[in-house]
């Protein structure tokens, strides 16, 4: 056991990273890509506007935040090993087939499974510091800590 880091539940961390790419990444990408197209000049009319705040401002802030997160994802991927970069970009983001990715890496199926797990763990480690560098809020920790002796999950508090 490390003196600096809590012991990770690698399989749950891999699942969390995969879920991030399957569920969150595409939406972040769409939000980041739409940040400029959703903004329009305000139109003045005699009718009162709604009082729930400035929709254009909120859309801009959401787009900038999503853009920073996409930049952090790209930065984190660039810090990973070559095989991990190929897997993260082509298998998890572009949704290419396992066969295509195996051919790109010149490896067999069982080896690709191992490399995919390693890629997810590398990404989880690199993503923490990338979010800080890109001033993302909130910081999303993709790590899952192992259960303690009583079977409870330990809290996911890290000093970064």
Show the residue positions of the predicted features.
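N-terminal interaction/assembly modules
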Residues: 1-78, 99-100, 127-160
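Membrane-interacting alpha-helical segments
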Residues: 53, 110-113
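A short pre-motif secondary-structure segment
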Residues: 87-88
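Helix-turn-helix DNA-binding module
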Residues: 94-111
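DNA major-groove recognition helices of helix-turn-helix
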Residues: 112-130
């Amino acid at each position: 056991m490390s003196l600096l880091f809590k012991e990770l539940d690698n399989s749950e961390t891999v699942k969390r990273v995969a879920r991030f790419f399957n569920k969150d990444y595409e939406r972040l990408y769409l939000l980041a890509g739409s940040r400029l197209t959703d903004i329009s000049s305000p139109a003045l009319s005699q009718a009162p506007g709604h009082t729930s705040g400035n929709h254009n401002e909120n859309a801009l802030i959401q787009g900038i935040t999503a853009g920073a997160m996409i930049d952090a994802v790209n930065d984190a991927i660039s810090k990973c090993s070559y095989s991990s970069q190929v897997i993260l970009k082509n298998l998890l983001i572009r949704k290419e087939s396992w066969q295509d990715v195996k051919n790109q890496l010149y490896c067999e199926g069982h080896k690709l499974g191992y490399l995919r797990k390693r890629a997810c763990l590398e990404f989880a480690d690199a993503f923490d510091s990338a979010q800080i560098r890109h001033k993302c809020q909130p910081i999303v920790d993709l790590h899952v800590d192992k259960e303690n002796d009583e079977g409870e999950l330990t809290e996911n508090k890290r000093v970064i």
